Amino acid sequence: MINKSIKVNIKIQHEDFDVSKETQKLHDSESGAIVNFIGLVREHNEHNNDKIKSMTLEHYPGMTESEIDKIIQKSIKKWELTGITVIHRVGKLLVSDQIVFVGVASKHRQNAFDACNFIMDWLKTKAPFWKIEESESQRKWVESRQSDQDAIYKWEK
């Protein structure tokens, strides 16, 4: 059953976000659980162990929001949810900066956990974002990983 009153919030922005404020916005009398995911800029690239100085994220305005909305609509069809917020930052980010916030509210915790995982897995592969990592030695585009593709296959079964 799809909840017609679900609160959906999608933002692409340069500025940081306040996890506490975004979580509070998901609170309502129908929700029994809220699950958040916060992605951060890591200091080391796990593939070549380069020490990262910064990461620059770019997106395709309009298309990015549309793709995120499609992902959210899929999650709404799969689970009974009461609210979803996706905030993704763009621009130059430094080590430990917040990149992405995914918050999901539901009547029941398992729905919130599953939907949050689903949304994040699909964001990693389907939302049009491009990343450039800058280290001491180089500046390079980040390629998609097979493990990210594998993560979405589990949801298609």
Predicted regions and their residues:
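Phosphate/diphosphate ligand-binding glycine-rich loop within oxidoreductases
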Residues: 102
